[in-house]
């Protein structure tokens, strides 16, 4: 919905006729634009700056109006680099907010914040566009059914199950495996549920975005021969983009997901990697707009910005959006305002632990810190609930005994505590799992473990039936039958060595 600027003389009458303004000031990615009296654009309108820089290169920068300053001026945030812009350049008011393509034609393609394809595979064949700013669905449209979303990952399905149509946070510091877990979830959901996913890469590494794209092509999640058979649309606003693009790219991805939910009536998965970068970009924009910073230097509008994004992610009577959001935790501090504000919106949290990653237990999901509102007997059933609680109790007891073991050694424990420690160590290892997307690193084929199989495995460990097996037999296996088979192989190998 863009209006190309017409060439015009600098006369005021022509400017008024074409709804054109001129750049009055440039502060990095923020532009002040002067418009003729009575021709002021609305907040969130898209403005387009077209022209040539000093070297003759074409410039095409889209901005979004953020503030009306008075004196016929507006302050706008650029969605791409402002290099080459000069004061006095013409700016066109499109009279509409940013709009992006939506629908089946977006599948298998990579877009930027403006909805322009950036994968060099030609234009997107769609005439359907949707504005990125919308209200959340009304109460009457919401669906309140509670059901579990099976992921095929043991530690998640057993201890912190995801809600269909819910919001899930992946918490963890740098380098503990958030992005690998997200890639595995996209892979499992496309294969096991046949669902459509939208991936929003918000302020993360371009290399990771490229790796994810290649991985998806290899695994068949994206079909280059026939895009209609692809299962995912990708929207990237990576680390090298200006803060305006990083702040709005989450809304672009969400708008595409909403169309699949509301018009196609599908169940959609929305991945946001990383929601912290959305907050960080908002903080940068807030400072550039001259707002007073709030706690720890964050923007004063942090809760409002987060709420306007999160409240649109929900289940309606037409379909659902289940959202999985990676949350970078600065300095591993969960009380930082960015992760703390995110917590308020989540139905489940998957917390990744550096301690488990150091032990080599992947996925490094902390079984005691991860939570879910779904883990209730009336939702998951008595058997699942009881097994999950007993697993947590065993691991908690092991955690309490670790100081005693470190000082006095295992031999000083009672018989009962020694048994608890042995079972807890088996459980800890059985919570690890080989991933499909990590096959190249681990050399082990990936495993999808159904919920019933997961519960059966942990019940067998807790019952004591497998006390005789070595704990390494439970490391990086799928279901419990693979663990017993691995134990037999280990025994044969040790006999051969003798």
Swiss-Prot record:
Bilayer topology: Peripheral membrane protein
Catalysed reaction, written as an equation: ATP + H2O + 4 H(+)(in) = ADP + phosphate + 5 H(+)(out)
Superkingdom of the organism of origin: Eukaryota
Binding site for ATP: 172-179
CDD domains xref list: ATP-synt_F1_beta_C, ATP-synt_F1_beta_N, F1-ATPase_beta_CD
Entry annotated with the keyword ATP-binding: yes
An example Gene Ontology CC term for this record: chloroplast thylakoid membrane
Keyword Chloroplast: yes
Outcome recorded upon mutating residue 86 to R: In strain: cv. Chipper and cv. Baekmibaekdadagi
Gene Ontology terms, MF aspect: ATP binding; ATP hydrolysis activity; proton-transporting ATP synthase activity, rotational mechanism
Record keywords: ATP synthesis, ATP-binding, CF(1), Chloroplast, Hydrogen ion transport, Ion transport, Membrane, Nucleotide-binding, Plastid, Thylakoid, Translocase, Transport
Protein localization: Plastid, Chloroplast thylakoid membrane
InterPro entries documented for this protein: AAA+_ATPase, ATP-synt_VA_C, ATP_synth_F1_bsu, ATPase_a/bsu_AS, ATPase_alpha/beta_chains, ATPase_F1/V1/A1_a/bsu_N, ATPase_F1/V1/A1_a/bsu_N_sf, ATPase_F1/V1/A1_a/bsu_nucl-bd
Principal place of residence: plastid
Enzyme Commission identifier(s): 7.1.2.2
Miscellaneous note of the record: The sequence shown corresponds to that of chilling-susceptible cv. Gy14.
Assembly information from the UniProt record: F-type ATPases have 2 components, CF(1) - the catalytic core - and CF(0) - the membrane proton channel. CF(1) has five subunits: alpha(3), beta(3), gamma(1), delta(1), epsilon(1). CF(0) has four main subunits: a(1), b(1), b'(1) and c(9-12).
Similarity-based family: Belongs to the ATPase alpha/beta chains family.
Function summary: Produces ATP from ADP in the presence of a proton gradient across the membrane. The catalytic sites are hosted primarily by the beta subunits.
Name of this chain's protein: ATP synthase subunit beta, chloroplastic
Organism from which the protein derives: Cucumis sativus (Cucumber)
């Amino acid at each position: 919905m863009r209006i190309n600027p017409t060439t015009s003389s600098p006369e005021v009458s022509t400017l008024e006729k074409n709804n054109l303004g001129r750049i009055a000031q440039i502060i990095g990615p923020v532009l002040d634009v002067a418009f003729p009296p009575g021709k002021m654009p609305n907040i969130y309108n898209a403005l387009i700056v077209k022209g040539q820089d000093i070297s003759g290169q074409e410039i095409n920068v889209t901005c979004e109006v953020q503030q009306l300053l008075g004196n016929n001026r507006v302050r706008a945030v650029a969605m791409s680099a402002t290099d080459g812009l000069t004061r006095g350049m013409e700016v066109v008011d499109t009279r509409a907010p940013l709009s992006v393509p939506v629908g089946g034609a977006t599948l298998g393609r990579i877009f930027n914040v403006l909805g322009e394809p950036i994968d060099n595979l030609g234009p997107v064949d769609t005439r359907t566009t949707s504005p990125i700013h919308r209200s959340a669905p009304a109460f009457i449209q919401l669906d309140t059914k509670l059901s579990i979303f099976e992921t095929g990952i043991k530690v998640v399905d057993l201890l912190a199950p995801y809600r269909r149509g819910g919001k899930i946070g992946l918490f963890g510091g740098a380098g503990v495996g958030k992005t690998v877990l997200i890639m595995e979830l996209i892979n499992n959901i496309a294969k096991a549920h046949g669902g459509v996913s939208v991936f929003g890469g918000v302020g993360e590494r371009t290399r990771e975005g490229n790796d994810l794209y290649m991985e998806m092509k290899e695994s068949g999640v994206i079909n280059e021969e026939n895009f209609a058979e692809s299962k995912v649309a990708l929207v990237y606003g990576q680390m090298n983009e200006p803060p305006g693009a990083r702040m709005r790219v989450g809304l672009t991805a969400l708008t595409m997901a909403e169309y699949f939910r509301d018009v196609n009536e599908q169940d959609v998965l929305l991945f946001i990697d990383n929601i912290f970068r959305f907050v960080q970009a908002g903080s940068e924009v807030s400072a550039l707009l001259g707002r007073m910073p709030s706690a720890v230097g964050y923007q004063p509008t942090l809760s409002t910005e987060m709420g306007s994004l999160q409240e649109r992610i929900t289940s309606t009577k037409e379909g659902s959006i289940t959202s999985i959001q990676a949350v970078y935790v600065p300095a591993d501090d969960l009380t930082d305002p960015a992760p703390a504000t995110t917590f308020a919106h989540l139905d489940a949290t998957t917390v990744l632990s550096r301690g488990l990653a150091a032990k080599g237990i992947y996925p490094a999901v902390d079984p005691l810190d991860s939570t879910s509102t779904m883990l209730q007997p009336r939702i998951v059933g008595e058997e699942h609930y009881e097994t999950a609680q007993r697993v947590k109790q065993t691991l908690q007891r092991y955690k309490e005994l670790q100081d005693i073991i470190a000082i006095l050694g295992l031999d000083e424990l009672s018989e009962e505590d020694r048994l608890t420690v042995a079972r807890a160590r088996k459980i800890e290892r059985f919570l690890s799992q080989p991933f499909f997307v990590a096959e190249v690193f681990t050399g082990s084929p990936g495993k999808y473990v159904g919920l019933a199989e997961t519960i059966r495995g942990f019940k067998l460990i807790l019952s004591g039936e497998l006390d005789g097996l070595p704990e390494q037999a439970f490391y990086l296996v799928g279901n419990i039958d693979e663990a017993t088979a691995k134990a037999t192989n280990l025994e044969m190998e040790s006999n051969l060595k003798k």
